[in-house]
């Protein structure tokens, strides 16, 4: 998993509350358990004017010109700001997969659904909770500048605006450690690879029958 230290990027404003996971990535695209192939269908119902289905050539689909991700100034956005209760609905991990593959590493909102919030950390993304007044300010500043950027400093736990104004955010120390060091569940386990091999070696001597191949 890619480490998250300091990220600076263009901000895309999704001025909508209660964005659920079905809106983030519709159910018809959930047949794959791979973590790739979802970016083109992120916010499918909002990005396109027709109904999406797996296997389509998205380049040929009619796009909604009013949706933020179809506007040139937000095409390379890596920071998403949204309203309260972002990621509500079903527990599909495909939602952070789609956001991540599109290019978003940070989502800023006043609140998140718990399962989506947890899934972000497992996929190298940082969900930042800021109060509604601060989020309102970010929306206003973003509307006033087409290339509005934010800098997110995880070590300092700060979101910095182009003027240098900084907003502090809270994060669990363990999750912070994992993001800073690029550790997902597998990476955490591999940190103890030596101890695991030592345990297995001792177990082979004390309980050799456990490691014997079963024969029909």
From Swiss-Prot:
InterPro entries: 3-IsopropMal_deHydase_ssu, Aconitase/3IPM_dehydase_swvl, AconitaseA/IPMdHydase_ssu_swvl, IPMI_Swivel, LeuD. It holds the Pfam family Aconitase_C. It is an enzyme of class 4 (lyase). One of its GO terms (cellular component) is 3-isopropylmalate dehydratase complex. Keywords: Amino-acid biosynthesis, Branched-chain amino acid biosynthesis, Leucine biosynthesis, Lyase. It catalyses: (2R,3S)-3-isopropylmalate = (2S)-2-isopropylmalate. Pathway: Amino-acid biosynthesis; L-leucine biosynthesis; L-leucine from 3-methyl-2-oxobutanoate: step 2/4. Disulfide bonds: none annotated. GO terms for molecular function: 3-isopropylmalate dehydratase activity. One of its GO terms (biological process) is L-leucine biosynthetic process. Its EC number is 4.2.1.33. Signal peptide: none annotated. Heterodimer of LeuC and LeuD. Catalyzes the isomerization between 2-isopropylmalate and 3-isopropylmalate, via the formation of 2-isopropylmaleate. Belongs to the LeuD family. LeuD type 1 subfamily. HAMAP family: LeuD_type1. This is 3-isopropylmalate dehydratase small subunit. It comes from Acinetobacter baylyi (strain ATCC 33305 / BD413 / ADP1). The gene is leuD.
């Amino acid at each position: 998993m890619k480490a998250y230290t300091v990220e600076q990027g263009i901000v895309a404003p999704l001025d909508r509350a209660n964005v659920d996971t079905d809106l983030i990535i519709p159910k018809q695209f959930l047949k794959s358990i791979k973590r790739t192939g979802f970016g083109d269908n992120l916010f499918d119902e909002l990005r396109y004017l027709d109904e999406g289905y797996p296997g389509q050539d998205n380049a040929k689909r009619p796009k909604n010109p009013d949706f933020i991700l179809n506007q040139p100034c937000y095409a390379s956005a890596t920071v998403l700001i949204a309203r309260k209760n972002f990621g509500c609905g079903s527990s599909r991990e495909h939602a952070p997969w789609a956001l991540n593959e599109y290019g978003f590493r940070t989502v800023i909102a006043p609140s998140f659904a718990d399962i989506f919030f947890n899934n972000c950390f497992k996929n190298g993304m940082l969900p930042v909770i800021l109060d509604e007044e601060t989020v309102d300010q970010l929306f206003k500043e973003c509307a006033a500048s087409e290339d509005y950027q934010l800098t997110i400093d995880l070590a300092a736990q700060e979101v910095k605006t182009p003027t240098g104004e900084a907003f502090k955010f809270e994060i669990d120390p363990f999750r912070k450690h994992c993001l800073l060091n690029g550790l997902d569940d597998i990476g955490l386990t591999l940190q103890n690879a030596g101890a695991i091999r030592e345990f297995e070696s001792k177990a082979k001597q004390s309980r050799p029958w456990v490691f014997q191949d079963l024969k029909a």
